[in-house]
Amino acid sequence: MVIVKSWQKIFTLLVVLLLCIGCSKVPSTSYNPWAVVSLPTEAKLLDIAFTENPQHGFLVGSSATLLETNDGGNNWQPLNLALDDDRYRFDSVSFAGKEGWIVGEPSLLLHTTDEGRSWSRIPLSEKLPGNPIAIQALGTDIAEMATDVGAIYKTTDGGKNWKAQVEAAVGVVRNLERSVDGKYVAVSAKGSFYSTWEAGQNAWVPHNRNSSRRVENMGFSQDGLWLLARGGQVQFSDPANPDEWLDAETPELATSWGLLDMAYRTPNEVWIGGGSGNLLVSTDGGKTWEKDRDVEEVAANFYKVVFLKPDQGFVIGDRGVLLKYQPEAAKTATTEPAA
């Protein structure tokens, strides 16, 4: 009798588990607008940028990886720079017209004024707080650089001189993001808090996380901030009250993979990259979600999503994985008549 009751309990638990998994499954997208791009490397890729020519771009990553495309990102060729060590980690690349910048670790800054045909190294002070991990080209001879402890510097003379924008660093960060209008948000190394900064402020403003879940990544939405937390949670700040947060959403409950990065393609369409080949999309600003299951077999964690323009986007994964957005596939899917 005891054995029968035990089996009944086990059976009931299995049924409940199966029902929960079934109910939590995110619906599939009706089409897949992403194509896997073959790359001549298995290095960890970290950033992508294009020159004023939308066909001409660069990918950067670990082990001094620098790849160049001249056909919009369909094909990439490796470039070797004359550096004293091939173990540099190229963290960030940015272009404004023909002028471009690359920053990396340890303490590396590269500059080009001819669309990347030649690169020169600009020495950085030994007193620089931390290593540069982010660079943003802002115009001719103008760029803004940030380090892994939240120090922010700006040059207006092509990198000859740099002026500190914030008086004190914020501490080691795991992620740092800059908005189009020059605001910053940084997540602490352990994800226990985040900080914000904007021009005119002397120091970073710290903020406690709003739940017990550690913060994975943060960035800027159309009218505030977005936040990805451990356990697959996504959250948006309240447009009416930027200091408050809307209720957290968990697009897929029964999952062990995390959400790693998010980017807007349009004001309403947003994509999230996650671990184990997971890619989610919302077409209503984050209210409901669908999963692109056509890329689930890609053996990579999708840790960076980039949309340079609505019709030009990329998903960067580990082990040399790159997905390219196919606007024609999306256009065809949205114009096909219903069956």
UniProtKB/Swiss-Prot annotation:
Pfam families: PSII_BNR
Cell compartments where the protein resides: Cellular thylakoid membrane
Protein origin, superkingdom: Bacteria
Alphabetical GO biological process terms: photosynthesis
Signal peptide extent: 1-22
UniProt KW Thylakoid keyword: yes
Main localization of the protein described in the UniProt heading: membrane
Lipid attachment residues per UniProt (N-palmitoyl cysteine): C23
Positions where lipid (S-diacylglycerol cysteine) attaches: C23
Assigned keywords, A-Z: Lipoprotein, Membrane, Palmitate, Photosynthesis, Photosystem II, Signal, Thylakoid
Membrane topology category: Lipid-anchor
One cellular-component annotation, GO: thylakoid lumen
Stated family: Belongs to the Ycf48 family.
Domain comment, as recorded: A 7-bladed beta-propeller torus, about 55 by 55 Angstroms, with a depth of about 25 Angstroms and a central pore.
Assembly mode: Part of early PSII assembly complexes which includes D1 (psbA) and PsbI; not found in mature PSII. Binds to the lumenal side of PSII complexes. Interacts with YidC.
Database matches in PANTHER family: PHOTOSYSTEM II STABILITY/ASSEMBLY FACTOR HCF136, CHLOROPLASTIC (PTHR47199), PHOTOSYSTEM II STABILITY_ASSEMBLY FACTOR HCF136, CHLOROPLASTIC (PTHR47199:SF2)
Function: A factor required for optimal assembly of photosystem II (PSII), acting in the early stages of PSII assembly. Also plays a role in replacement of photodamaged D1 (psbA). Assists YidC in synthesis of chlorophyll-binding proteins.
Protein name per its UniProtKB record: Photosystem II assembly lipoprotein Ycf48
Organism: Nostoc sp. (strain PCC 7120 / SAG 25.82 / UTEX 2576)
Gene transcribed to yield this protein: ycf48
